[in-house]
């Protein structure tokens, strides 16, 4: 189950939409229509991600993975909490406000994605590509940590 029918969801559906039974929930009818037209096998529901009744009707109780990808960090955190309460094993939330990340981690959200951090990691990978095996970047309010793994040679 995915909440939010934006570009991140469309990119995800490009990769996974045909392999899994997917339900996308979004209150914006135009975005929902676009996803439904582009991915006919995906069930699209025009509703809020915070509507617990809709989540139940769409089968959150039997859902293995819940992806909260709306443009609202707060909505994503709350909907992941609801998913956990309904027995969902894996949750992922898109959180754009960096100050929310530690709190979201303490709420047992399995994975957190943040465009700023992802982009920073990609830039580091590109800049250091020739001499670096992998790189990751974590940035919080008052600190930034960069992990770079350099191959032996």
Regions found by a protein language model. Give the residues of each.
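Cytosolic regulatory regions of ion transport systems
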Residues: 1-153
């Amino acid at each position: 189950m995915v909440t939010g029918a934006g570009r991140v969801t469309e990119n995800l559906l490009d990769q996974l939409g045909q392999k899994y039974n997917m339900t996308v929930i979004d209150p914006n009818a135009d975005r929902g229509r676009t996803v439904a037209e582009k991915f006919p096998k995906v069930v699209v529901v025009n509703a809020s991600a915070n509507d617990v009744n809709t989540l139940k009707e769409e089968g959150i109780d039997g859902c293995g993975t819940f992806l909260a990808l709306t443009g609202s960090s707060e909505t994503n955190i709350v909907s992941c909490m609801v998913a956990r309460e309904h027995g969902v094993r894996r949750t992922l939330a898109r959180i754009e406000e960096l100050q929310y990340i530690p709190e979201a981690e303490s709420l047992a959200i399995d994975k957190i994605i943040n465009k700023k951090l992802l982009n920073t990691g990609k830039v580091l990978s590109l800049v250091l590509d020739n001499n670096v095996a992998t790189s990751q970047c974590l940035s919080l309010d008052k600190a930034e940590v960069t992990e770079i793994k350099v191959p032996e040679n």
